[in-house]
């Protein structure tokens, strides 16, 4: 009976992840549409990300003969680890899934980032190596702040399960510590997903790129997997932000849309900061989380 229940929860979690995977390009399209409206532009269709993925999927994959198997496997690992993290989220279809431990969730995403950084070095190109080194530099500051956000929520809810955290989120988010954690996690969300002000996902200037530098040598289906996984990762963080940190009594779908609009607004009102100022930005988020932990 217990095994059947666990298998059911796993199946529901995978169904939820598939739903998020299908909706991820739409959320990215909505963010771009919000940015276009705020800049008095018409902008591309909210369905444009689907067209781009279909375009890349139909093109051949060109690989240099000097790359190893790591270069080919990295997009698949990045995609699968992000999909596995999406399976662990509570809510939507799976109710309160019991296998979503927050530490496993964090390090699944870190594993995907590690493989992408290694693959950028594997191509032995100047821009790829630069992007990989910058990604690792940012990750060195992001990961401790993410763990502080996790610690703050664990202390609030007395649980490391994402499901357990979501059950007690209403009573937590109305406190001063909850508001500080909400703001800090939103700042971490932008940094973790390479959004402005930490990185610009739409830039064409190689010298200012971080995440996009690591994808310059990819093409075809491997490039489609990378972009799709990045869009899914952004949606996963928005769902997590909506379920655990956003203090609004609304359905999760509406809170995710509010988070997506907030990302678009913040990106429009800010410029990309210099690389060496990222640590100050993340230090501010870390300080808010530390205050949230002390305030409990």
Q: What are these regions, as identified by a protein language model?
A:
Residues 22-34, 112-120, 182-200, 260-269:
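Transmembrane alpha-helical segments that form the membrane-embedded catalytic/substrate-channel core
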Residues 12-24, 96-110, 170-192, 241:
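Alpha-helical transmembrane segments
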Residues 262-289:
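Interfacial loop-to-transmembrane junctions
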Residues 4-5, 9, 150-179:
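Juxtamembrane/interfacial segments at transmembrane-helix boundaries in multi-pass membrane proteins
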